[in-house]
Amino acid sequence: MVWHKSPLHPILITIALSAGLVAIPASLSRAQNGANAPARSEIKVGWNSFEPPETGAPGRRVGGGTRSICPAEARGLTALVPQTNMGRTMSASPTVILYVPALPTEMTVEFTVTAVSDDNYTPMSQQSFQTVGGSTIALPLPETETSLDVGQLYYWDFSIVCNPKDKSGNIVVGGWIDRIEPTSVLTAELQNASPEKAFEIYSREYIWYDAAASLALLRLAAPDDKTLAKTWQDLLASVGLEDIANAPLATMTSTPNNQSAAP
């Protein structure tokens, strides 16, 4: 299920990628073996070629202003998605990425995933954890609860809970996910591709969630690599989010009753 806004423009990316797929926590150790290889990139704007249908559902990628009791710092909450809030994935359990600004105190945040069909909204999962923010986090969808179907539209949202008794004032951002079925040609190309080539393919095909997660994986493995940092800056600039490109990256770790951001 893909909604086209305009013809695609070419994208050329060459990067040293040391992870095979996009599941960040599972693949991080493999990336650490060679993530420091040189990389060069040329990223062109084209991610907005896909947009969700008019369902009436929200689509905010930046927290923005609020009259709630939320601290002013919370308004910088940002979903790392294209301007249309729409991104594609080939994964049944993709990783979403968002920036959580530094908060004045530890606060509760919530992450939910909803299946959307016409005017029907079916909740699939909800997670909550405590954080003081201050980083860009890579947050995988829970495999045990959330397996995305091809052709089904999904919406995820992430909120900073400012008043547990009245969540209408929460700072909320979110994005759309469209899981696509790759063609046999694309599948074969990825199966035979080196990690470097796989990232190039994701980007060439404008598969946002997989491309962004792959690059985030590299940066997590080599946070001091200046070339990877520049590639990350270019990627975020291509969707108008260059202002948060220098924030440190973190993954998510979880226990049955608690979740937290771990650098």
Language-model-derived ranges and their functions:
Residues 12-23:
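Bacterial N-terminal signal peptides
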Residues 37-56, 68, 86, 130, ...:
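Extended, polar beta-sheet/loop recognition surfaces of beta-rich domains
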Residues 75, 83-104:
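Contiguous beta-strand segments within globular domains
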Residues 96-98, 136-176:
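Extracytoplasmic/surface-exposed domains of secreted proteins
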Residues 102-111, 117:
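Solvent-exposed loop/turn segments flanking beta-strands in beta-repeat/beta-sandwich domains
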Residues 122-135:
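Solvent-exposed serine/threonine-rich low-complexity stretches and specific carbohydrate-binding patches
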Residues 214-216:
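Inward-facing hydrophobic residues that define packing positions of alpha-helical scaffold repeats
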Residues 218, 223, 229-263:
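Preference for solvent-exposed, low-hydrophobicity sequence contexts
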